Amino acid sequence: MCSRVRWTLRWESELQLDDHVELASFFRKTYGPTGAFNAKPFEGSRSWAGARPELRAIAYDSNGVAAHMGLLRRFIKVGEVDLLVAELGLYGVRPDLEGLGISHSLRVMYPVLQQLRVPFGFGAVRHALQKHVERFGRHVPANVLSGIRVRSTLPDARLDLPPTRIEDVLVVVFPVELAMSDWPTATFIDRNGPEL
C-alpha cells in the first residue's frame, strides 16, 4: 500500500493531549503485534515507553500517524568516557506502511542532529535488525557496532525487578560534530537512565 506522508518535527512541550492520545494508539497498534507486553507502556494517553523524548519526527498521512522517531539529548558513559549524544529511539511505522522504512525518518532527523550540534547520534537495536540498520548508510553516515553491552535503568522502580537491565544489542552511531574515530572504544555503555 502506497501512502503519501508528511513529516513534522514537534518539540515535546508543543504536543497537546490529543497528540499524545493519537500517538499512544499508534504505538499500541504498532508494537502490539510483537507482543502484548510491548504495547503495555502505551496505555491511555502515554506516548512514550521509557525516557520521554524531547523532540519527535512524526509522519502523518490521510489515516493519521504513519511513523515516528524520538530524540533525547543525554550524557551516556561509553567505557569510562562521559559523552553527549542525541539518542534516537521510540521508532515505529504503521504496519500497513512497513516499506516506509526507518531510513526516511533518519533523513528527516539527521539535519536536526546537525542543527543541535551534538557530537553523535546514538541508538541501540536488537541483533535481528542488523541487516535493516546496515542499510542506514545509504542515506546518513551510520556505524553499526556489535559486542557492546548497554545498561539502562527501568522506567519505573519496581519491587519485583532489579533497577537496571543489561542488554547485548547492536549500537548504531551517527557521527555529527565529531568523527567516528572520536567515538571511545568500549564494550560497555551506561545510559544512566531508561532507554528512549
Swiss-Prot record:
Localized where?
A: Cytoplasm
Q: Where are the transmembrane segments?
A: none
Q: Name one GO cellular component term.
A: cytosol
Q: What is its EC number?
A: 2.3.1.-
The alphabetized UniProt keywords are: Acyltransferase, Cytoplasm, Nodulation, Transferase
Q: Which domain of life is it from?
A: Bacteria
Q: What InterPro entries has UniProt attached to this entry?
A: NodA (IPR003484), Nodulation_prot_NodA_CS (IPR020567)
User: What PROSITE patterns does the entry give?
Assistant: NODA
Coiled-coil annotation reads none
Record GO terms (molecular function):
acyltransferase activity
Q: Name one Pfam family in it.
A: NodA
Q: What does this protein do?
A: N-acyltransferase required for nodulation. Acts in the production of a small, heat-stable compound (Nod) that stimulates mitosis in various plant protoplasts.
Q: Which family does it belong to?
A: Belongs to the NodA family.
Q: What is this protein called?
A: Nodulation protein A
Q: List the source organism.
A: Sinorhizobium terangae
Gene name for this UniProt entry: nodA
